[in-house]
Structures are given as structure tokens and as C-alpha cells.
């Protein structure tokens, strides 16, 4: 029995994801596929276009056997913590043989060599890094220069570490090395569209372009453009959600509530929230007082140091009330500590029986039972998860689906 692990967002599931899933199964020879998937908020600090249960259906319909949720504390974090949390889940459930990720570079040996340098930090690399930092370079620029010097320019470091999926892939490899995992890493070269391309140009287009198309087309029923770039099952599930009024959900939907919260605060109060430092509270306050849209709010806060993605994560943290104190408490743990099941099929049911025997972390099949037995830190982590969904559903078009507590009432998806 060979088990493949995939780390995904599926926002939404499209033909590129299908290619990745099928090719990953092919090159690994896997019999089963386990996905670790972000919940209702994703790594860029944005809401997913449809909820995690709908996206679980998309994954299972396309060939995944078991979907496990990546906790919010990892899902909406930097690439390093996102990757580390997801890898730990796949490692700790005790049954995964392979991890396969997409990358622009396509050569896992080169990416793993870079990961090895960054994890082991050989003395000469550290010396190069210190030299560049002393010369006034930012940490990312200093790291790039140190890697170039250490590898004697034998590989194209700038090209590799400037590509988003290469960066994430290196973080997966670093995480595997740090925990000395026996999971074998594989990569597939991404095809066609760039991760951040905003226009649909063919049968394989980026998730960003699909979300942009949905936001501007106002489609509420079957759509030929989406049918070209997404599997039919995904399109059907997407429009089932839209027709019910459970989406689409966009970051702009949060503009009124986020701005209202900030406008009621002083800069001193804003400073208490996670990752707010170095006077950023003043920029946040000023931006909230003047911005007329969510995009304007984000752009007004951004600096060279604070990227758009980082600012969006900070704003979502403010929305959810994540303080610096919370961050200190939650960061004491270097793993998610549990595996919450979102959905499975008949093959996934077989996997669950194996996980119950081999997992070093508890399986969560019923949240209401699990949360009663948690220590205070883990309970706080789950409370944030519950709150995130309670806030997410407030953006549904249909008021009938906006009730709080859906983390407790929504059933596991079984297909």
C-alpha cells in the first residue's frame, strides 16, 4: 500500500490541480491520496472563494481519498510555517510514503540541495550570509547572495528562489529534513500559466485568474469559460454553492467589518495584534480612516518590508482578534497537534483505520468531543478556527446560511 500526500488549497480546484494530482499518482505509483488542505482562509490572508466542505467535495470527486484540514494557525501563515504544519500532519499520521508538489524548476534534487544548505547552515554559508547582512542587505537579499556564493554560481539561485512554488517546495523539503521524516519528496514541473496570472488563457489557468473571472463575470449558473479550465465536477459543486447563496466569498466582503473594527481603535490598541510592530499601527489606522475599498486599505498599509500578503494576514488577524499574546502562546508548539478530517471516500475509510493504528496525533472526527479534552493552548487554537468560520459565513449571500457554530453542525463529507 503506497500513500501519496498532497498539500493544497484548491481555491477552487481546476485542471492544473487535476494534472498535479494525476501525475503525482503516476510518478509515485501510489494507491491512495491524502490531501492536507487549507480551511476557509488561505495562505495569502484571503477567504477561500467557497467553503472548505465544498472544496473537499471537489478534491474527493477528482481522485483524492482523504482530506485533512490544515489548521488556521498554519494555513494563514508564512510559507515556512504553512509548509512545516502541513508536512508535520502528513508525517505524524504515520502512513504517508510520498509528498509531491508542483514547482517551476521541476528538479527535486536541486531544490533539496538548497533546502539542505538552509537547514544545516554550513560555516562558509553562514560567513557569506553575515558578510552580506553587514553590508546592509535585507535578509532575503543576503540569503540569495550567500547561496550564490556557496554554490559557486553552479545553479541559478535568483531564478529558483524568486518563484513562488519553488520557494514553497524548498520549505516542504526543509520541513522534511528538520523532522528527519522518511517521506520521499517528489516534484512536478508546473505547466502553462503562472501562479499569479490574472487572466484565463486556456484549459490550464491559475486559480487567481479563475477567481478574478468569477468576481467580474457574476456567473451564477454553468459557464463555458470555467468549464474549459475546471473539471465538470468542480464547476457543478461551485455553482451549487453559488446557487444556494454560500459564495462566492471575496476579501472585499470583509471591508466593512475590518475597517469598522480598526476605526474604533487607537493606534495603541492596534499594536496589541499579531505581527503589528515598528509603527505599522499608525499606517493601519490612517489607511482605515481613508480607504474606500479593501484593496485601497491593503495598498495604503504596504511597504517594502510589509508585502501585500503579509498585510492581508495581519488584517485577518485583527478581524479574528489574534493578539501578540496569542501568537506567543500558539508558537510554543511546532506541529498542529491533531488531524481533523474534512472528508473521505471508501478508500479513504481504509486509510482512516490505518491512521488510527499508526498516528502519533489524535484524529478529530467530531470537534465537539475533541475540544472538551483539550489543554488551554490547543483549545484557543480551535476557538480561532471556530471563529474564523463564524466570520466567513457572514459573507454568504443567503442569510439562512449565516448562522454561527457551523464547525459543530457541518458533517464530514463522505463520498
UniProtKB/Swiss-Prot annotation:
Molecular function per GO: ATP binding; ligase activity, forming carbon-nitrogen bonds; tRNA binding
Location, primary (coarse class): cytoplasm
Keyword tRNA processing in annotation: yes
EC numbers: 6.3.4.-
Record flagged with keyword RNA-binding: yes
InterPro entries tied to this protein: Rossmann-like_a/b/a_fold, tRNA(Met)_cyd_acetate_ligase
GO cellular component: cytoplasm
Keywords for this protein: ATP-binding, Cytoplasm, Ligase, Nucleotide-binding, RNA-binding, tRNA processing, tRNA-binding
Pfam families: HIGH_NTase1 (PF05636)
PANTHER family noted in UniProt: TRNA(MET) CYTIDINE ACETATE LIGASE
Recorded family membership: Belongs to the TmcAL family.
Protein name, per record: tRNA(Met) cytidine acetate ligase
